[in-house]
Amino acid sequence: MRVPFDDKMWAGRSDDGEPGDTRRVFNQIVPFDGSLRAHGDTTVVVGFGSDEGVRRNQGRTGAAHAPKELRRALAGLPAKNSMAMLADAGDVACDDGDLEGAQAELANVISEVLASGGRPLVFGGGHEVAWATYCGLVLHQHRREADESATPRKLLIINFDAHFDLRQKRPANSGTPFDQIANDCAERRVPFNYVCFGISDLGNTASLFVHAQRLGVRYALDVDMQETQLPLRLQELDLMLDEADDVYLTIDLDVLPAATAPGVSAPAALGVPLFVVEEMVRRVRGSGKLRAADIAEYNPSLDQDRRTARAAARLAYRLL
């Protein structure tokens, strides 16, 4: 179900009367109207109010309420001159258990945003959002190829996550999106170019590691994603970015340490420091190849002092 843009979700402190630039993100937001090319670089926020995939995956529900809280956390951050134009396309809600229908609806919205010249930034919701974001990218590519003699483009999927999310069990859930993507790539005879940063060796079964190897997944364990290893990880990331035409970035907040992100279904005992994730996200954004991004698994009912929301807002801010 589509939920229209609501400007009441974007509010914050006003410092009118103070000297200098006192703008905040909420001052920059405009409704998405389907025509952005004249405005240049534009990020378009889309909410995905779903935790049906989390429920199916036997996790703790509550992520369906995340989009509103993530907007709230982002709204009060300071605006900057280099910030892209920011629009909001409203939400897609899954409130009747029809996850597949909600994913198809979100894919259509993402395709519309891409066709307008915008760059979608999706606020989940469970990580089932990843299948929908990917489908939106594919749908847009199919429409481009139908309209012009477009050449196939190499898509790099970057996932910051403690888990592979390569479960093969169906129906689809928050743990299956990248297996679904792998199957779709095989059917379309295109490479499955998937890298996962922050994998926990204690959060994935041996069979998942075998399946990842079989699919050619590249990954870095959480123990190899600490601050001292950041320069090496950035070098590896640069090589991957050089090889890609387009990038889809997805962030599961359970990649962060539990102290930083308690508000997730499966908090991480170790996790990847926020500084490391943030620096790598900056590098992806700076590549000029980012086409879509999403932030998943925030559960407001489990958060403490809005720590997780604030961490998510920092990451979202780096993507603007």
Curated annotation (Swiss-Prot):
Mn(2+) 1 binds at residues 127, 161, 165, 252. Binds 2 manganese ions per subunit. It comes from the Bacteria. PROSITE patterns: ARGINASE_1 (PS01053), ARGINASE_2 (PS51409). GO terms for molecular function: agmatinase activity; formimidoylglutamase activity; manganese ion binding. It catalyses: N-formimidoyl-L-glutamate + H2O = formamide + L-glutamate. Pathway: Amino-acid degradation; L-histidine degradation into L-glutamate; L-glutamate from N-formimidoyl-L-glutamate (hydrolase route): step 1/1. Its cofactor is Mn(2+). This is Formimidoylglutamase. It comes from Paraburkholderia phytofirmans (strain DSM 17436 / LMG 22146 / PsJN). The gene is hutG.
